[in-house]
Amino acid sequence: MTASPVLGNLFIIAAPSGAGKSSLIRALLEKHPDQSMQVSVSSTTRAPRPGEVQGVHYHFLSTEEFEQRIDAGEFYEWARVFGNYYGTSRKVVESLLAEGKDVFLDIDWQGAQQVREHHPEVRSVFIVPPSLEILEERLRVRGQDSDEVIAERMAKAQAEMSHYHEFDYLLVNDDFNNSLASLEHIVLAQRQKMPHQQIRYSSVLKELLG
């Protein structure tokens, strides 16, 4: 049985800081080492941090180059955060999808709105913590932020979570393994939808139907 090439699926994975999004995505990729799934590498104008590698963690661009790409319409979505640009490259995403890879966009609800304008078929997942108390505890365990910064993050998290209803799926990350299984089911089920299966098994269907 020969399967025909098929485009990968595009997913938006969004969550407030501390909900466990990055850990879930990382664990899902580790479960599928065949590289059939991949996180899109964003572009940014901020300076690389120690240990960050060009093209692996981010595509680092100058402000001038980033703004030129905005004018040329080369981003699905972009935003300016604390004086630095961040964006999702059309070319990067479309190249990965053409290779048949499922692509995850790690963006916020505002970026999700922009992406839906270009990719109405995108599937989106919003991840939330089981409670505000647990979210604050997770932020404090990191040991990276002051009380003031944590308070700001909590306020921002509540504002972000008010947009949960704009997404296709909602995951409450109260148990990591259960949440990982749910995220995996969402991704794998999308691969079985009719448009993809019709392309993937076009030769089989042609033979069966004569």
UniProtKB/Swiss-Prot annotation:
Q: Which GO terms describe its cellular component?
A: cytosol
MF terms from GO for this chain are:
ATP binding; guanylate kinase activity
**Chain sites annotated for binding ATP:** 15-22
Q: Which branch of life, at top level?
A: Bacteria
The record's catalysed reaction(s) read: GMP + ATP = GDP + ADP
Q: Where is the Guanylate kinase-like domain?
A: 8-188
Q: Which family does it belong to?
A: Belongs to the guanylate kinase family.
Q: What does it do?
A: Essential for recycling GMP and indirectly, cGMP.
- HAMAP family of this UniProt entry? Guanylate_kinase
What name does this protein carry?
Guanylate kinase
Q: By which gene is this protein encoded?
A: gmk
